[in-house]
């Protein structure tokens, strides 16, 4: 593949569930911040030549990172919601007919072979593609009971259920238009693919590794550190 690709990384969130003294993307594991590892993994794909990072306007951490001086990095002001930050990143891309990958700032363990398969699948598709992992556990649908505890309503058939991962890859204009339309109509948009789904597109599912975890809870840090150490040995 000779086409150059851009990635957008929304990194304006505060990560309150981590209960840390700083946003989770700036926590250190395996010698670097999570954000630095995430960007390193994206640049492991030779076609990804630019990464746009959307950060909070009051972010006091990014400027001290080596990333701040990397010519391949573009920084834009993020917004209150993920979609706002993604929009800001998309606005910095001049060619709306090109492809863009959107990747979570706190997902530092994505592997090169997953990136390669995602890019190949997206370019073959009219509706883009996402990395995803099949659901393996038994899934329960719950409801809140009078005592405040959660009760089981039913067991959900896990056939054809997938965990949506990132990166997610789409044409820039297609993603922009889908996000705008879905949000204007009040649709619940939890990831980029959900905006395209709302607009009638069928993005492709590309089976990815389950160790491409998103650091969300404190216990995720040790696991992400272990996975990164394995990556560094390869």
From Swiss-Prot:
Job description of the protein: Catalyzes the formation of 4-diphosphocytidyl-2-C-methyl-D-erythritol from CTP and 2-C-methyl-D-erythritol 4-phosphate (MEP).
InterPro entries in the record: IspD, IspD/TarI, IspD/TarI_cytidylyltransf_bact, ISPD_synthase_CS, Nucleotide-diphossugar_trans
Superkingdom as given in the UniProt entry: Bacteria
Pathway assigned in UniProt: Isoprenoid biosynthesis; isopentenyl diphosphate biosynthesis via DXP pathway; isopentenyl diphosphate from 1-deoxy-D-xylulose 5-phosphate: step 2/6
Lineage: Bacteria, Pseudomonadati, Pseudomonadota, Gammaproteobacteria, Vibrionales
Family the UniProt entry places it in: Belongs to the IspD/TarI cytidylyltransferase family. IspD subfamily.
Protein name: 2-C-methyl-D-erythritol 4-phosphate cytidylyltransferase
One BP term from GO: isopentenyl diphosphate biosynthetic process, methylerythritol 4-phosphate pathway
Residues marked Transition state stabilizer (site): 17, 24
Record's catalysed reaction(s): 2-C-methyl-D-erythritol 4-phosphate + CTP + H(+) = 4-CDP-2-C-methyl-D-erythritol + diphosphate
Short name of one Pfam family: IspD
GO molecular function: 2-C-methyl-D-erythritol 4-phosphate cytidylyltransferase activity
Keyword vocabulary terms for this entry: Isoprene biosynthesis, Nucleotidyltransferase, Transferase
Keyword Zinc-finger: no
Enzyme Commission number(s) from the entry: 2.7.7.60
Residues flagged as site, Positions MEP for the nucleophilic attack: 158, 214
């Amino acid at each position: 593949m000779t086409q150059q690709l851009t990635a957008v990384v929304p990194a304006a969130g505060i990560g309150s569930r981590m209960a840390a003294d700083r946003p989770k993307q700036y926590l250190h594991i395996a010698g670097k911040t999570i954000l630095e590892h995430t960007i390193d993994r994206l640049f492991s794909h030779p076609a990804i030549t630019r990464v746009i990072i959307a950060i909070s306007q009051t972010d006091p951490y990014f400027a001290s990172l080596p990333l701040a001086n990397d010519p391949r990095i573009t920084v834009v002001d993020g917004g209150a919601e993920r979609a706002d930050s993604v929009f800001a990143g998309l606005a910095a891309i001049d060619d709306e007919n090109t492809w863009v990958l959107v990747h979570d700032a706190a997902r530092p363990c994505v592997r090169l072979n997953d990136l390669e398969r995602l890019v190949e699948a997206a370019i073959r598709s009219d509706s883009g593609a996402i990395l995803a992992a099949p659901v393996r556990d038994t899934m329960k649908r719950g409801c809140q009971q009078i005592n405040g505890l959660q009760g089981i309503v039913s067991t959900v058939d896990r056939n054809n259920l997938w965990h949506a991962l990132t990166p997610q890859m789409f044409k820039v204009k297609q993603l922009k238009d889908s996000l705008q339309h879905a949000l204007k109509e009040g649709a619940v948009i939890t990831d980029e693919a959900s905006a395209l789904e709302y607009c009638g597109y069928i993005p492709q599912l590309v089976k990815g590794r389950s160790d491409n975890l998103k650091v969300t809870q404190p216990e995720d840090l040790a696991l992400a550190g272990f996975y990164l150490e394995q990556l560094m040995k390869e």
